[in-house]
Amino acid sequence: MILLIDNYDSFTWNLYQYFCELGADVLVKRNDALTLADIDALKPQKIVISPGPCTPDEAGISLDVIRHYAGRLPILGVCLGHQAMAQAFGGKVVRAAKVMHGKTSPITHNGEGVFRGLANPLTVTRYHSLVVEPDSLPACFDVTAWSETREIMGIRHRQWDLEGVQFHPESILSEQGHQLLANFLHR
């Protein structure tokens, strides 16, 4: 079962739908509706941290979940979840040079992890005004994808199964979103 932590964002349900279409059993819980003990009792096999309209500091249990389950369970962070992943390990989340709300843009990636087998460059949909500051990215992460302006669009932990994407693979305008999520689901 995938535990999908909802950071009060409607895109959470797009992620839910995509994972269900891929055959996953998914349980959605709001970021303020469960504890780490509750999660232990649920015994998820994977965790997804959803997008949201706030900063990682305002994302309920999301930061604690990443810190607690890093190295224990595979975790995928999407948009806010991606930012929370970097911040949980000491990275800084800052205002983006340009607000991207409902905009598509090409990204380049390294072809590994969730990007395995995907087009390169890949057109994705972005809904964010914050980004991970490149100079602050903890050394335990590799940058796996970047925009034309070199903003970080994907990260992966060097040792543990933690991966984040700044964009929205669950948006209908993103290319190969199902495949990206399948790459996370089936590893």
UniProtKB/Swiss-Prot annotation:
| Transferase found in the keyword field | yes
Q: Which source organism? A: Escherichia coli (strain K12)
Name by which UniProt lists this protein: Aminodeoxychorismate synthase component 2
Question: Which pathway does it operate in?
Answer: Cofactor biosynthesis; tetrahydrofolate biosynthesis; 4-aminobenzoate from chorismate: step 1/2
Which gene produces this protein?
pabA
Q: How does it assemble?
A: Monomer. Heterodimer consisting of two non-identical subunits: a glutamine amidotransferase subunit (PabA) and a aminodeoxychorismate synthase subunit (PabB).
- The cysteines covalently paired via disulfide bonds are none
For this protein, what is the EC number? 2.6.1.85
Q: Provide this UniProt record's keywords sorted from A to Z.
A: Folate biosynthesis, Glutamine amidotransferase, Transferase
Q: What class of enzyme is it?
A: transferase
